[in-house]
Amino acid sequence: MTRGAIHNRDAFLEHIAHRLGRAPRLSGVSRPQWSNQPQWKVLAGYSQDDLLNVLQKQCGLIHTDYIETTSAELAGALRRQVAAYGGGPVIVPDDPRFAEYGLSALLRDEWPAEQTTVHIWNPALGRQNIDAAEQANVGIAFSDITLAESGTVVLFSRNEQGRAIHFLPKTYIAIVPKSTVVPRMTQAAAVIHEQIEKGGLVPSCINFITGPSNSADIEMNLVVGVHGPMKAAYIVVTDR
């Protein structure tokens, strides 16, 4: 990802300083130490197993299927969930974690041999990736950070993982390594801030997805699937 350019920043800051009646401050500015930070107390002290219990209960409230499995059984669990959602076509990002978790054979050999179409996102194909996402019945991706409190998967978009994978297919499956589960948005924001503080680049698009697409009118009549997948499942890998 290339760095962007900031235009007219100095002029903008000088204008603000002028309106405040002082000269621009070029040094000595630090982040304040807040006296109260209650956001860190929510689910504080919870073990990873405790957080999984919170996540599982929340999935029941957000109409999301929750499955626990191990690395050794992941391929079978994924196969069963895709079948439960009606089979392919399937779209996935070009993510090395699929190989690390033993899913390459399923994606590249087994499903194609069964006439289940699998599209692996390829930035060189451009618009064809979006067309494949529109035609897909199931989108599958790994969660980068998982928020137990809200049942949210956090996904960092990149060239090999377009956001269309998460929003255009009829159904969606997130593979959730247990180690990615944190209490809430507070910890996810801290991870992103830490990357920035270290001089790293963060994705231009970070998606926070909480179950299937939900919409409601003023009378709170819930409609599922208007703006994205109609069904969603989280497959938690308990030994990763």
UniProtKB/Swiss-Prot annotation:
A GO biological process held by the record: lactate metabolic process
Cysteine disulfide links: none
Pfam name, any one: LUD_dom
InterPro entries: FTHF_cligase-like_sf (IPR024185), LUD_dom (IPR003741), LutC (IPR022823), NagB/RpiA_transferase-like (IPR037171)
Family: Belongs to the LutC/YkgG family.
PANTHER family: LACTATE UTILIZATION PROTEIN C
Function: Is involved in L-lactate degradation and allows cells to grow with lactate as the sole carbon source.
Protein's name according to its UniProt entry: Lactate utilization protein C
